[in-house]
Each structure stands twice: as structure tokens, then as C-alpha cells.
């Protein structure tokens, strides 16, 4: 199995405010990325999973990653 880089776009609602987000993760499957998003945003912003809407999960090349940590980890291997 190969670890891939994914970019996730979506929206979460905190109170009356809807906040867009874009995150990048390294994972084996898109399902793992989905779980990471729910876990990280829910924990950091105290938002329940029902208030987090994932619009897209796309696989990207490691060179396209904007997050320097994700890019560096992906390119070193």
C-alpha cells in the first residue's frame, strides 16, 4: 500500500457562522482522510460531526501540497 496526499475542502458551522476550510493530509484511503477531518476540526473547534460538511476529497501530487509539513514528508520518501 502506498501513502497518498489528499486535499479536503469543506465548511463547518460554529454558532451562526459558517467557516470554509481546506486541509491536506497523508493517508492510505480517502475514508481515512474523512475521519481525520472530523476528528481534527471537531476537537480543535468543538464542532459536532453533523456540523462539518466535506465538499471534496481529491488526491494530489506531493509537489502540489501547500502545507510544508505534508509536502516535506511526502517528498522525502
Curated annotation (Swiss-Prot):
One GO cellular component term: ribosome
Record has Nucleotide-binding as a keyword: no
Coiled-coil ranges from the UniProt annotation: none
Cited InterPro entries: Ribosomal_eL20, Ribosomal_eL20_dom
Keywords: Ribonucleoprotein, Ribosomal protein, RNA-binding, rRNA-binding
Pfam name, any one: Ribosomal_L18A
Molecular function, one GO term: structural constituent of ribosome
Entry keyword Ribosomal protein: yes
GO annotation (BP), single: translation
Family, similarity comment: Belongs to the eukaryotic ribosomal protein eL20 family.
Self-association state and partner proteins as the record states: Part of the 50S ribosomal subunit. Binds 23S rRNA.
Official protein name in the record: Large ribosomal subunit protein eL20
Underlying gene: rpl18a
Amino acid at each position: 500500500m502506498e501513502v497518498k496526499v489528499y486535499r479536503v475542502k469543506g465548511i463547518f458551522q460554529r454558532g451562526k457562522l459558517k467557516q470554509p476550510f481546506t486541509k491536506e493530509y497523508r493517508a492510505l484511503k480517502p475514508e481515512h482522510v474523512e475521519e481525520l477531518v472530523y476528528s481534527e476540526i471537531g476537537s480543535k473547534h468543538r464542532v459536532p460531526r453533523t456540523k462539518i460538511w466535506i465538499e471534496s476529497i481529491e488526491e494530489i501530487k506531493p509537489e502540489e501540497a501547500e502545507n510544508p509539513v505534508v509536502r516535506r514528508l511526502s517528498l522525502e520518501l
